[in-house]
Amino acid sequence: MPTEEEVRKAEAEYGADAIQELKFPENVRERFGMYIGSKDARGLHHLVYEIVDNAVDEALAGFCTHIEVTIHKDGSITVADNGRGIPTGINHQSGKTAVELVFTVLHAGGKFGNGGYKYSGGLHGVGASVVNALSESLDVTIKREGKVFHQTYSRGFATSDLTKTGTCPIEETGTTITFLPDSQIFETTEFNYGTLKTRLRETAFLTKGLKITLTDERTEPETQKVFHAEGGIREFVTYLNRGNEVLYPEVLYCEGEKDGVLVEVALQHNDSYNENCLGFVNNVITPEGGTHIEGFRRAITKIFNQYARDNKILKDNDEALAGEDIREGMTAIISIKVEEPQFEGQTKQKLGNSEARNAVESVVTEKLTYFLEQNPTVAKIICDKSILSQRARAAARKARDLTRRKTALDSTSLPGKLADCTDKDPKNCEIFLVEGDSAGGSAKSARSRATQAILPLRGKILNVEKAREDRIYDNKEIKAMITAFGTGIHDDFDITKLRYDKIIIMTDADVDGAHIDTLMLTFIYRFMPELIKTGHVYLAMPPLYKVEKNKKVWYAYDDEEQQRILNEIGLDNTVKIQRYKGLGEMDPDQLWETTMDPERRILKRVMIDDEDKSEVDLTFSILMGDKVEPRREFIEENAKFVQNLDI
């Protein structure tokens, strides 16, 4: 207990002057998590999205047709648009130019008050000022009313006055912003071309007719990609379905307005068993859904049940189709525009507007009902697939119940092949999923028995991308993983029952090992995605090379490290180099030292950003689906990112 003197001192110190107000830019620089989420690569790229979103607002308002994003060799990035250009006059309320207001005041911009943007993704109006606050340098050039203006900023402050630097044709307008992220703030300041490509492609699909050019000047020759979708979200659905066979050629499309909400929906079924329905509000993805998704699902369930009853596809006594049955294999984009979107939190994860639910349900019900009446063949295909899904779901439920009864998840009913750890606190425990018997044997001998469990996977793992849930219970390896993890799957999933803090996939460093990695990741992503979202899934990184000289041993995890070691020790006839093809080539001591020892090993955590859901779904369907051509294109496009190729 504090003494009376200590209490009096604390009370005296905690006066009005103890309350500190952080002003711009300190409030952003010290509390950046409130504005961009994190200081890692995700937060870094968020800066680009903020500026691009401002340009997209111009496009949504009908004033911008082209956005150019350029990554420069010095690490800076430029976003240029041909919109109206930021106003350059004096704002009478503040006495500052409108440009300086936009870049140095939070919640300033054309999305507030009248005469600005009707629909805007940047709800909070903090984009440009936050980018300024978190940039080592920022330059803005504006073309407006036949004049060219320029101003510079650094870490939130203007470093020059807004100056007229020249003239331009009166019809030539726009804003060009170049900024260099602040290395004092960010863990990395290197922009990822692939990350930006995914986001900008998505933006182009959502903004019909908008052209977006992405250029990377860091490569030789420079890399450039142009995104332009006259078909809008219809083309988006076609793009997302390219890894699967579609069940009918048309992309079903609905468009309308109700209660001030603009609704646009496109959907198409494919031959997979996965639902991929993505929601967007004013071009901002809502990973956790919200009222617009609720309205869509309600409409879809009602429409198809009504159609199936009216056309005797479902008999009077048949069970109604569940929404998940109708959405099996469905790819859908639900894109709405709302004047005042109500998001849950700054990161806009979930929409809360009740009018959005009613608007989407109303528009989809009206338009889709008419389409089905005019296209009975398509309607029958969807209903038939839904009925098959319903039957499979019932079979899966029975198999799941049977599995539960046979293996109540306790220590006495764990898989026989599992070498479990003795510590029962999940926070301390990890499980290695090991390919093959020989490697499994070495791993069991190498492990720390207290905290490391080993599950050898002997048979072939089912490719769940091509199988409904009822079939996975027939696969021994997948059943063993489900039982060992303890969480259950799909609707039964419960993260609190997870038996291990780390699930580590440990396979050979060759093509077969990579294939098994992908099979296991596909299973976890499709049936237990929360394990990935919460950071519990890892890939072990066994060494590729063993380098030996004069009885000293070095391990190299890639070609670059091997070369570095050889440069240090000198390459002569006393050097022995072994290329590991499999985990079984290492004895238990080597396996522990290189791959399993928490003090020395390298693990790669598998993470998925909610904003990348569409691209992740597409990647799994391309890699694990039946269509060869999209897989070939994917490999060709991504081959340059591969560090080690085993042929």
Residue ranges and their predicted role:
Residues 391-410, 425-430, 441, 445-447, ...:
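C-terminal interaction appendages of subunits in large macromolecular complexes
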Residues 29, 86-109:
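Short conserved segment of the HATPase_c
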Residues 89-94, 292, 323, 470:
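Conserved, non-catalytic sequence blocks in retroelement Pol enzymes and Pol-derived host proteins
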Residues 57-58, 85-86, 511-512:
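Residues immediately C-terminal
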Residues 30-49:
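Conserved short strand/loop->alpha-helix "switch" segment adjacent to the catalytic nucleotide/phosphoryl-transfer site
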Residues 1-18, 49, 57-59, 64-76, ...:
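GHKL-family ATPase ATP-binding module
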Residues 24-25:
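Alpha-helix capping/hinge segments and adjacent helical runs
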